[in-house]
């Protein structure tokens, strides 16, 4: 074995075992989301990451749900889908199936212009991840899961949500269209949120619907 293999697996150890498992990738059209407002929120927020992540495009701050209610609404739809197809079952001492609570960890907006892409990545250590299409056409770049046994490529459609286990590798090829491909993404974690007292800004008396002010521009 090479020195690199020794470093990854441990000196004298064999490579990790290979598993073939099935995981749900849920694709649904949802109604009732305010796509025009979501686009405005993303454009007003602007680029906060500067291409420093796998997504080589405009990418907003991570906590858009704390300042924009419409991001929270999309997350609630993602939760509904995730609850409907748990990755495993948990029982109490009497054998009764328990519902594992999910909470929204983070969510952000993305705008892909022509030629922009997202490199292969995953969202571990979250449990579920999702992406929602605010605007795209059938010729826009798909969401690709390169490690699926059979090629899995999901063409975006406006008002489409895709929910999948966070550890699945995925990517977005270079965007071929002249118009923008506008998305939002988020992560759901299991368990109760640690900071339960932190209310979203839009759920406070101070909120007026404005995207101006120190909280909006906070890093």
Could you tell me what each predicted segment is?
Residues 1, 175-178, 219:
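A hydrophobic alpha-helix/topogenic segment detector
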